[in-house]
Amino acid sequence: HHRIKNNLQGIMGMLRTLDHQHPQLHQPINQVIGQIHSISVIHGLQGRADADRVRLCELTCAVAAGIESLWDTPIHVDIPTPWQACRISPTEAVPVALVLNELILNAVKHGGQAHQDVQVALRKGIQADHIHSTIAIPGQWPVAPIPPRGGQSLVSALMPRSGATLLRTQDADRAVLRLEFTPPVIHLESPPSP
């Protein structure tokens, strides 16, 4: 996993060089760098002793930090304490990372960067093994449905068929995406022994 992460970081370096040589391509190159970073994060988290234990909370923080740095936009991630961690199924780790990347990046591009305000929160659902990840920015959703394009099409293609749902809501003056994860995509970790 460490070698894969290093190789992906090398690719990101080459893309940054290309970005400096072709400033007119800045936005699409940054988008690709962000996607590669999200995959790299997975391999970094899997490079630990327990390779199959990628935690949703750690992945969310790492993806948000990467986008925050790349797009120079503050992203506030709120995870309550105490928090019982859940791990992502190994087969879903890369798709979940890319979905989180696309949703947070879209929030940055569609108002979060202009307002310097992107809020990401993890909360327990009604059942113990359900987790809600919300991404909120100032503004209103358009009245008419938006046809899928770009990042939205990628999200639709990568969303797990079972164990993940995406819902758009309006919370006063904030446009909110609620991503709910359930088994088989996530599994609660056992609480540490006393």
Question: Where in the sequence are the language-model features?
Answer:
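Conserved phosphoacceptor histidine of two-component systems
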Residues: 1-9, 13, 17, 102
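Short beta-to-alpha transition helix within the HATPase_c
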Residues: 30-41, 45, 52-69, 73
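Conserved DxG motif in ATP/Mg2+-binding regions
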Residues: 131-140
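Conserved short strand/loop->alpha-helix "switch" segment adjacent to the catalytic nucleotide/phosphoryl-transfer site
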Residues: 1, 23, 65, 69-116, ...
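Short acidic helix/loop segment immediately C-terminal to the autophosphorylated histidine
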Residues: 15-27
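ATP phosphate-binding glycine-rich loop and adjacent ATP-lid/helix-beta elements
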Residues: 143-170
